[in-house]
Structure formats: structure tokens, C-alpha cells
Amino acid sequence: MASLKELKGRIVSVKSTQKITKAKKMVAAAKLRKAQAAAEAARPYAERLEGVVASLASKVGASDSAPKLLSGTGKSDTHLLVVLNSDRGLAGAFNSNIVKAARDKALELQSQGKKVLFYLVGRKGRPVIARLFPGQIIEQYDTTGIRDIGFDQASEISARVMELYEAGAFDVAHLFYSKFRSALLQIATGQQMIPVPPPAEAPASSGAAVEYEPGEEEILADLLPRNVTIQIFKGLLENAASEQGASMTAMDNATRNAGELINKLTIIYNRTRQAAITTELIEIIAGAEAL
């Protein structure tokens, strides 16, 4: 059994840890409000842009003059998985869930005879993916030191991904990130990004005749790169909100667990102290009787 000094030391240590986790929970809660507002503000624009691109794509179809980001390379042998992670831990299963979704997709593609490459954003997913898929990380985007990752970083990432696409490094690109639902729920999500996938259902028609100037293909040539950037930007914002939500929940759980452990250790400490006092009293009484 641990001594009173050891028990007291453990209680002090756990209380110190509890103060840290409580402070981190409060910081995450403050950051969550800002990140959630940014993610929710970006969703309508990103979804509307996807709808416009899908509508134009359905009109252009697979014509020979269609932009490459729409028509594709004509094959689907090599797939690039763009995986968005964070640089920090203490966020529960936030990073591991994204890596798991990307891993499952990679294994599925490899079982079909496809070649899989990875473009990684953030540090946390690198060790696992490097171990599971050695030699398949084509590039890494370092976010170390970036306080609030945003549109500038999304533009750099999308520009590099499209550069690799034009160079023939891959045929299909998928984006993996965590979709924010609430502080308690974040969903690891994967979606095809390049070439633009056909809409799940035919775009709704308003009944009005629409003419495009200079033309659908020219407009698509301008919108498609922007759409790639916006989808990555949306993923980064969703990730930021998801990370703070997961961190707040994890720190709340850690704070409550620390409280429970403190209570248990305090009970053990009091029982041990009471037993020691009782033993001393018995020894004193026995000594007095001997006299």
C-alpha cells in the first residue's frame, strides 16, 4: 500500500493536471466559437459553387474541348489522397479518424489494382501513413507555425495539387477531412475532388432559359480551379472547427476523470491515515497496559 506521503503527492499531481485540462477546455471552447462561425459561413458558398459547377458540367458533358479538371485524364490508374490533419494532439480521436478514413479508401483502391499516393497536410497523420504506406507520400504541406490556417494556405495546396495533376502525377484526387457537426460529433469525410464527379442527381431546372457568355466551357475553365481551392478551404475550416470541438470534449472528459481520481485517492488517503492513527492508538494503549 502507498504511504501517506506518496498518496498526497499523487493527489497534488492530479490536481495540477486537472487545472491544465480545465484551462485547455476553456481555450478550446473560445476557439470553437470562432472556428464554427467560419466553417458555417463558408458552407453556403462552397455548396453553391459546387451546384453551379455541376450544372455547367451537365451541359458540357464529356466533349473533347471540356477542361481537363472536368473530363479527367481518360483513366483512373493513380489516385491521390489529400489528407488534412492538424499539428497538435489532445483532441481525442480527431486525427486518427481522418487517417482511418483515408487508410480504408487507400486499401480499397489498392485491392482494385490502383496505385495510391498521398499528399499530407499537417503533422499528426504522417507517422501512421508513412508506416502503413511506405514510399507513397508524394508530398507534405507543412503547417508548423501557422496560427490560423486559411484561404492563403488552401490556395497554395490547391495550386500544387493541380500542378501535379497537369504533370500527370495522378488521375483522380480525393479530399479527406473532418466534417463538423457539433462539439460532440465530427465525421471523417472523403470526397472526390479531381476530376469533378458527376452530380448525384440531375440539377433542378428553374424553367428559365439560361445563356452563358462567353460560354459554358470557358466559364468552367475559370470556375473549376476555383472550385478545387474552395473545397480545400472548406475542408480546412471544417477541420479547424472539428479539432476545437474534439479538443474541448477531450479536455472536459479529462477534467472529469481527474476529479473522479482525486476523489478516489482522497478516500484512500483518509482511510490510510485513519488506519495509521488507529494503529498508533492501539500501540499507546498496549504500552500503557504493559506499565
UniProtKB/Swiss-Prot annotation:
Belongs to the ATPase gamma chain family. It is found in: Cell inner membrane. F-type ATPases have 2 components, CF(1) - the catalytic core - and CF(0) - the membrane proton channel. CF(1) has five subunits: alpha(3), beta(3), gamma(1), delta(1), epsilon(1). CF(0) has three main subunits: a, b and c. Produces ATP from ADP in the presence of a proton gradient across the membrane. The gamma chain is believed to be important in regulating ATPase activity and the flow of protons through the CF(0) complex. This is ATP synthase gamma chain. Coiled coil: none annotated. Keywords: ATP synthesis, Cell inner membrane, Cell membrane, CF(1), Hydrogen ion transport, Ion transport, Membrane, Transport. It comes from Sphingopyxis alaskensis (strain DSM 13593 / LMG 18877 / RB2256) (Sphingomonas alaskensis). It holds the Pfam family ATP-synt. It is a peripheral membrane protein. One of its GO terms (cellular component) is proton-transporting ATP synthase complex.
